Curated annotation (Swiss-Prot):
This is Formate dehydrogenase major subunit. The gene is fdxG. It catalyses: formate + NAD(+) = CO2 + NADH. PANTHER family: FORMATE DEHYDROGENASE-O MAJOR SUBUNIT, TUNGSTEN-CONTAINING FORMYLMETHANOFURAN DEHYDROGENASE 2 SUBUNIT B. Transmembrane segments: none annotated.
Length: 1028
């Protein structure tokens, strides 16, 4: 290598490195030929959490200089730090340095060509964007919002009751934003009185809360990712974690190395099935039949954990004599209203109001006996007839499940959207909840029901109540039937029905008042019911399907999309597109230039619209992404983990909290100048931050935790907290106005000792994956929920090798923080402390709107013409299907094939379509069909095919595969078609291919309780339209 001295210094730009090397006597050629400096040596390193799924893998971020934030100095006044490298964090106890293809490609997302860099405006009827300033954008949006609010705000309803609601502008909130941004968003929407509010959680895991909370007391994953390694048997039904959560699935593989078996029950032979011991191909939409068949098997063969069932479930409780189930209907059905009177779905009570029990389990009205009768119809023959799973294979799986009924073996269940996105999603999960209670697997390491969350903070944003009928901490938003604070609290606080139980929700008033003091400060007083009238009172359920309906009817005028790409996410894309075209204004807050922000643009066949006909004003506001902000997010296992800002945001992008705060500030000025509607409730909301236009994550995290507003003393007169100190635990909350907490579940996450969510002690003295020094897990840093159930009533472990808690004379804390009080061994206080009964519910009484026990109902679009169990009641009789959507129900004669949607490991919805590495890995839209169906339709691998449902069509490349088998269902052959969900009408410049939104095909009806859309089971046809 020959380089002159002059050229050498020119290359080095006269830099110190070159001159110093030369002065030391090195020849220019030798210096240039020397190994280059390690690229990370001078980088700024920060720790973060992956922004995709809720495995929440740890990341190390490296940037060119220290990013600016309010707590530290910037690298320089004229420079910005830029992210240039991401790798896995080897210290993280779940991911241990690993990243999946999505996480590995996240650098391309942060630095994507499709990042939104400055505010843009699309005028009504226009076909182009105009760049505008932040000042102009905020002023115009605030004006539109105030005008709509003033014209449509309802302070009092027709009965004269204060409701303070605004129902003509809605918001779809982000599930990847931090807890801190979520809390501020919650305050912002309640300040405005906005009631059309929802979150991505509703379109995915809505049924999780609706099923797990009535079953056990809380609606969250019961164990955690690492704990999966402790299982003897892993049932994967309703998910494909090897594909969708590959780094988390490593712990299932670890269990397999330890001798565990994996069984997959899924329509496809998927990635998880490829490492399983057994795979049962099942018809999509028939899971309840399979699982109720398992329950029948366990009860008939007596393979249940008897002591656990007797003491820790409601098996012994006597059910009302009026309860019955006949011909597909539970007692109390109202055909006109399509709902149930649930008064007979309850216990028998004695003269003291306590539930009656028969501990011998002999009484015919015992829950266990009613359950036996209910499942008696689910024979192996009926299981095969409805699900397509052969009897021999079904019984083999039942046998493996039954083996875990002994105290020293556990089974865990892993599920995700394959369970939830059905019209019977809640009851899918309930079926497995019953099984796990019968087997004694709840509360056990290696047991539980593990809901695998799909978005990085969908758990946290759900906890923060960003749902139609929610407040933080799973308290219900008041509705127009709630007349006062006292009436409301009485309605939502469960009564004691079994003596000596914890029934921790008895403290709901403390959670609510502390939240209201966080929201309204000195404006919330005992005299005004702690500001109860300030809160909006909902008049209906505003789920996403309803948002779209109201837009199409001209009743929803404005829509704010906060990191939610609705055009690609909501069902029946054409209906969503039609509704968006009728909006007066649309505000899109997103790091990326999403399809939703350009719904008005003609992209040809996949989005064939005329911009001139669309009069919606559209604002595209650039926001920061995960790498450009600090805060906390919550993984599937309820671990709250802090992440630090890794680089500066590009262009003029701003954090969500800044944008919301600026809009509030501008609207506040307009109200001061002009007056208007709902001013009192608007101004009552506190916004006491150091910089009101830009609240910091630290301020918000502390506000979320909560403070003492006065000196607090214990019952013995000892000082617990001085005024202004942060609280240590939710047991110290009070309902007298002396404490605050934005969310009672998170008290203890930031104390006077500091930020507990930033803890990074990954030691595991238990050997069971219980790293309580890492982050903070709600509630109270407990890592396994219902853990008292892992011991018998005398405190002896069911399995001494799986023991995380034990009695120490004062409490049950040991390797884990016990999910229990301080009652000693032998106490009759049950382990399910959030349940009024103190036990897990095999029979859900009146807690679930469509039945106290699961029952098989056909999908709305079914490949068979009947329900073999009860032909007069084919589908769930409580389903809500809007009149206009009934016209779009497809028949199996026109659309004979069952379609189901799913993810690929290389992509995350349509998000990664803006990430070059992920596009290169999976560039082209395809569909999967089985070999027999392909032969019938004359389709070969690589052919272009058209898939059509009653809602529309898409085109994609055919992948002919052995992974999909035809099934015999009720005497006919049923084929499945697999539809990956990741493509859309846009494509990153020069990379990948444009495609169609899979949601062009999906139906606009949802699960009966949460309205989560039925993405997983609907009918389509397929035809060849082009050669390979």
């Amino acid at each position: 290598m020959q380089v002159s001295r002059r050229k050498f210094f020119k290359i080095c730009a006269g830099g110190m490195a070159g001159t110093s090397a030369a002065m030391l006597g090195f020849a220019p050629a030798n210096v240039l030929a020397a190994p280059r400096e390690y690229k990370l040596l001078r980088a700024f390193e920060s720790r973060n959490t992956c922004t995709y799924c809720a495995v929440s893998c740890g990341m190390l971020l490296y940037s060119t200089g220290k990013p600016y934030n309010s707590l530290s100095s910037h690298t320089g006044t004229n420079t910005r730090s830029k992210l240039f490298h991401i790798e896995g964090d080897p210290d993280h106890p779940v991911s241990r340095g690993a990243l999946c293809p999505k996480g590995a490609g996240s650098l391309d997302y942060v630095n994507s060509e499709s990042r939104s860099l400055y505010p843009q405006y699309r005028a009504p009827g226009s076909d182009k964007w105009e760049r505008i300033s932040w000042k102009d954008a905020i002023k115009r949006i605030a004006r539109l919002m105030k005008d709509d609010r003033d014209a449509n705000f309802v302070e009092k309803d027709s009965n004269g009751k204060t409701v303070n609601r605004w129902a003509t502008t809605g918001i779809m909130t982000a599930s990847a934003m931090s807890n801190e941004a979520a809390l501020l968003t919650q305050k912002w929407i309640r300040m405005l009185g906005m009631v059309p509010v929802c979150n991505q959680a509703n379109t995915u895991h809505g049924p999780t809360v609706a099923s797990l909370a009535p079953s056990f007391g809380r609606g969250a994953m019961t164990n955690n990712w690492v704990d999966i390694k402790n299982a003897n048997l892993i049932i994967v039904q309703g998910g494909n974690p090897a594909e969708a959560h590959p780094v988390g699935f490593r712990w299932a593989i670890e269990a397999k190395k330890n001798g565990a078996k994996i069984i997959v029950i899924d329509p496809r032979f998927n990635r998880t099935a490829s490492v399983a011991d057994l795979h049962a191909p099942i018809r999509s939409g028939s899971d309840i039949t399979f699982l109720m068949g398992v329950i029948r098997y366990l009860l008939e063969t007596n393979q249940i954990q008897h002591e656990y069932v007797k003491h820790y479930t409601n098996a012994s409780f006597l059910i009302d004599e009026g309860f019955k189930f006949e011909d597909g209907l539970f007692v109390g059905y109202n055909e006109e209203k399509r709902n149930y009177d649930k008064s007979k779905w309850n216990y028998q009570f004695d003269e003291n109001g306590h539930a009656k029990r028969d501990m011998t389990l002999q009484h015919p009205r015992c829950v266990i006996n009613i359950l036996k009768e209910h499942v008696s119809r689910y024979t192996p023959e009926m299981v095969e007839r409805i699900t397509g799973v052969k009897q021999k294979l079904f019984l083999q799986i039942c046998e493996e499940i039954g083996k875990t009924s002994v105290p020293n073996k556990t089974m865990t269940h892993l599920y995700a959207l394959g369970f939830t996105e059905h019209s019977i999603g809640t009851q899918n999960i309930r079926s497995m909840a019953i099984i796990q209670l019968l087997l004694g697997n709840m509360g056990m390491p290696g047991g539980g029901i593990n809901a695998l969350r799909g978005h990085s903070n969908v758990q946290g944003t759900t906890d923060m109540g960003l749902l139609p009928m929610s407040l933080p901490g799973y308290m219900r938003l008041p509705n127009d039937k709630d007349t006062s604070y006292d009436q409301y609290i009485n309605a939502i606080t469960p009564k004691d029905i079994v003596p000596n139980q914890v029934n921790y929700y008895r403290h709901t008033s403390k959670f609510f008042v502390s939240m209201m003091k966080t929201f309204y400060g000195d404006n919330a007083t005992k005299e005004n019911g702690w500001g109860f009238d300030f809160l909006p009172k909902a008049d209906r359920l505003y789920d996403p399907i309803t948002h779209v309906k109201l837009m199409n009817e001209g009743k929803l005028h404005g829509w704010i999309l906060q990191g939610f790409n609705v055009l690609n996410s909501l069902p029946n894309k054409n209906k969503t597109l039609s509704g968006m075209s009728k909006l007066k204004y649309l505000v899109v807050m997103d790091p990326l230039q999403t399809e939703s922000s350009e719904f008005w643009r003609n992209f040809g066949e996949s989005n064939n619209v005329n911009p001139a006909e669309i009069q919606t004003e559209v604002f595209r506001l650039p926001t920061t992404c995960f790498a450009e902000e600090e805060g906390s997010i919550v993984n599937s296992g309820r671990w709250t983990q802090w992440h630090w800002k890794g680089c500066d945001q590009p262009g003029e992008a701003l954090p969500d909290v800044d944008i919301l705060s600026m809009l509030r500030e501008e609207m506040h000025e307009l109200y001061k100048k002009e007056g208007g509607q709902g001013i009192e409730s608007f101004e009552a909301m506190t916004w006491n931050y150091a910089q009101p236009h830009s609240p910091s994550a630290v301020e918000l995290a502390k506000e979320l935790n909560g403070y003492a507003l006065e000196d607090l003393y214990d019952p013995n007169g000892n000082l617990m907290y001085k005024k202004g100190q942060l609280l240590n635990g939710f047991a110290h909350l009070r309902d007298d106005g002396t404490t605050t907490s934005g969310n009672w579940l998170y008290v203890g996450q930031w104390t006077e000792k500091g930020n507990q969510t930033a803890n990074r002690d990954n030691s595991d003295p238990s050997g069971l994956g219980c790293t309580i020094g890492w982050g903070f897990a709600w509630p109270a840093n407990r890592r396994v929920l219902y853990s008292r159930a892992s011991l018998d009533i005398n405190g002896n472990p069911w399995d001494k090798n799986r023991q995380l808690i034990k009695w120490n004379g004062k409490n049950w804390n040991w390797f884990d923080i016990a999910d229990y009080g301080t009652q000693p061994p032998g106490s009759d206080t049950g382990p399910f402390i959030m349940s009024a009964e103190g036990v897990g519910r095999l029979f859900a009484v009146d807690k679930i709107a469509n039945g106290p026990m699961p029952e098989h109902y056909e999908p709305v679009e079914s490949p068979i013409d009947t329900n073999p169990f009860h032909p007069n009641v084919v589908t769930d009789p409580t389903l809500r299907i809007y009149k206009e959507d009934r016209e779009f129900i497809g028949s199996n004669k026109e659309y004979p094939f069952v379609a189901t949607t799913y993810r690929l490991t290389e992509h995350f919805h349509s998000w990664t379509a803006q990430s070059a590495l992920n596009i290169i890995a999976q560039p082209q839209q395809f569909v999967e069909i089985g070999e027999k169906l392909a032969a019938e339709k004359g389709i070969q691998k690589g052919d272009m095919v058209k898939i059509t449902s009653r809602r529309g069509y898409i085109k994609a490349v055919a992948v002919v595969t052995k992974r999909l088998k035809d099934l015999e269902i009720d005497g006919r052959v049923v084929h499945h078609i697999g539809l990956p969900i990741h493509w859309n009408m846009k494509a990153l410049n020069g990379k990948g291919n444009r495609g169609f939104s899979t949601n062009t095909l999906t139906p606009s009806w949802g699960e009966a309780i949460t309205q989560t859309p039925e993405y997983k089971t609907f009918l389509v046809n397929i035809e060849k339209v082009g050669e390979a």
